Amino acid sequence: MKVWSDRRIIDNKAPLDSFSYPLHYGGPAVWEGMRAYVQEDGSCKIFRLKEHVQRLRDSSKIIGYNIPYSNAEIEQACEALVQQNGNKDLYLRPIAYLNVDAESIHGIQTKDLKLDIYCVPIPKLHRNSEKGIRMVVSNVIRAYPQFTMQAKTPANYADITQVQPLLDQTGVQDAFLLDNQGYVVEATVANFFVVKGDVIMTPPNKGSILPGITRRTVAEVLGDSALMFSKYKKVPRVVEKDITKADLYTADCVFLCGTYAEVVKVSEIDGRAIDGDDSYFRIIQTEYSNVVRGRK
């Protein structure tokens, strides 16, 4: 593991005091997940680096704190980490956090966040198999305005601890979460798409979902009518729509998407098999790989 911390790259985890403010109170902190891919020419490139760094910056603004590095400095630090790790597929996790102790809760004087960036080789994910993963719809609510999901902050993901007992009980790999109206908005750490015929639906960005960079990339590929028609003779219609449980149960195909998991098919939801036409999922798997590997 390589870590960029205080303008230097170290070989171990950055030191974290167990009496730190973020550990006790869930913030202030913001983070990002990025992937670097080996390209066709043998180089290694971070996918959508500028977009990820800007989202990190935006997250810090939303929670009212400052990252004391420019976007260019953060991008350079990420690229230096990739060079240190050699040409292999990598996962990067920048995290900016308030570096004060828990007793400072009523007397914080600084608005500046400390920044560490972790970089590790990424393993092949078993859940990326063609078989797909099993999921349930949980009763856990992740909704605006209780959660400001436009900010990628640890506090917004604390509800994973509420979901985990359900996953352990049912033996499934992930769960969908709801908004205040009972619509399905996200998986625990991923956006999702629902395919029905040539219509591909995804929840609207109304505050209850993270505006995913992978989600946007998938939508761009599916919306490239020239590519879809010339290569696959299929032209889908991608729409943002409030998603119900019935939309999930009657779908031809459902798939998750996110930086770490990439694109993952869902094979079962609440004990109901999702086993219709999965051709759009297979197209996205192929074309997403082409995009991140520099083949497109």
Regions found by a protein language model. Give the residues of each.
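Short secondary-structure junctions
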Residues: 83-90, 227-229
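Short, internal active-site loops enriched in acidic
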Residues: 97-102
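Helix-start/capping segments and mature chain N-termini
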Residues: 1-69, 73-80, 103-296
